[in-house]
């Protein structure tokens, strides 16, 4: 269930609220285009600016709109363990298929603190947990040994979204666990290199815009057809880089609006609209790929 091309879905807003109509359209779009799973309320979904009740409602909406046609992985991590447990229990009750759990951010726990945080969540819930290691945002790196300990101790800890930018981490974590461990790239530009050494797929930003091709690339890689997969990787390299010319999800949400995938470009402060010169660069790249006119 948790392999291949999984989209880190944007959250559409309109008039200060979650835009149900656009959200349903996005989920239908990904079902139609062959996306393997949806992460809802993750970093790309602006989870940090959702209220607790909005967070719960967004997950419930996604489960409802997916209607068991595509797995829903709910972003329910937090830097307060009790909050992460509450959100995860709520997602489990709503019918989510899995949970994405970010390493606690800002408070910079030790490796033992990270272990105890995820231990508490794993013991209080039964939903499959995918841990999320992104030190550039959290300020702390969950080491492979800490992940391996959690993976060994708790059967509902099934994998990790790895976003350190270090491809060698894949081999290291497999050596500490087993080849079946679910390792997912957290960086579109590193998806293919990571899958070449054993990762199972990606939680992708670019998938918001080109889901069919990202899904095909991942399927080819899982089948060992790396030369064919590399052709897709090379084709979209420029898009992968352009989607990070400003803080994610600002460029991808702007692109989705320009492509007509959502009805409003609205973002929540402190995220703000793109600089005009960067938006022009984004438009140029989207035109090059035939995504807008």
Curated annotation (Swiss-Prot):
It is an enzyme of class 4 (lyase). Coiled coil: none annotated. Its main location: cytoplasm. It comes from the Bacteria. Keywords: Amino-acid biosynthesis, Cytoplasm, Diaminopimelate biosynthesis, Lyase, Lysine biosynthesis, Schiff base. One of its GO terms (molecular function) is 4-hydroxy-tetrahydrodipicolinate synthase activity. It catalyses: L-aspartate 4-semialdehyde + pyruvate = (2S,4S)-4-hydroxy-2,3,4,5-tetrahydrodipicolinate + H2O + H(+). Homotetramer; dimer of dimers. Catalyzes the condensation of (S)-aspartate-beta-semialdehyde [(S)-ASA] and pyruvate to 4-hydroxy-tetrahydrodipicolinate (HTPA). This is 4-hydroxy-tetrahydrodipicolinate synthase. It comes from Persephonella marina (strain DSM 14350 / EX-H1).
């Amino acid at each position: 269930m948790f392999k291949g091309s999984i989209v880190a879905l944007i959250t559409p807003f309109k008039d200060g609220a979650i835009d149900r109509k656009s959200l349903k359209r996005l989920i239908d779009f990904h079902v139609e285009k062959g996306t393997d799973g949806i992460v809802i309320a993750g970093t790309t979904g602006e989870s940090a600016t959702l209220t607790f009740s909005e967070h719960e409602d967004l997950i419930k909406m996604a489960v409802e709109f997916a209607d068991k046609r595509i797995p829903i992985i709910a972003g329910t991590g937090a830097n307060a363990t009790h909050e992460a447990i509450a959100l995860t229990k709520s997602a489990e009750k709503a019918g989510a298929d899995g949970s994405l759990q970010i390493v606690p951010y800002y408070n910079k726990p030790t490796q033992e603190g990270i272990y105890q945080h995820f231990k508490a969540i794993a013991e209080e819930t039964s939903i499959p947990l995918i841990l999320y290691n992104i030190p550039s945002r959290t300020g702390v790196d969950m080491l492979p040994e800490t992940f391996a300990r959690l993976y060994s101790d708790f059967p509902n800890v099934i994998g990790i979204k790895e976003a350190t930018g270090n491809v060698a981490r894949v081999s290291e974590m497999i050596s500490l666990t087993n080849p079946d461990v679910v390792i997912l790239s957290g960086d579109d530009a590193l998806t293919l290199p990571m899958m070449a050494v054993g990762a199972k797929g990606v939680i992708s930003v670019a998938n918001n815009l080109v889901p069919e091709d990202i899904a095909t690339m991942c399927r080819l890689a899982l089948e060992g057809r790396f030369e064919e997969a590399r052709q897709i990787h090379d084709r979209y390299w420029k898009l992968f880089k352009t989607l990070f010319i400003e803080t994610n999800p600002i460029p991808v949400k702007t692109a989705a609006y320009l492509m007509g995938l959502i009805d409003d470009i609205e973002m929540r402060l402190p995220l703000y609209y793109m600089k005009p010169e960067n938006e022009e660069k984004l438009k140029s790249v989207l035109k090059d790929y035939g995504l807008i006119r």
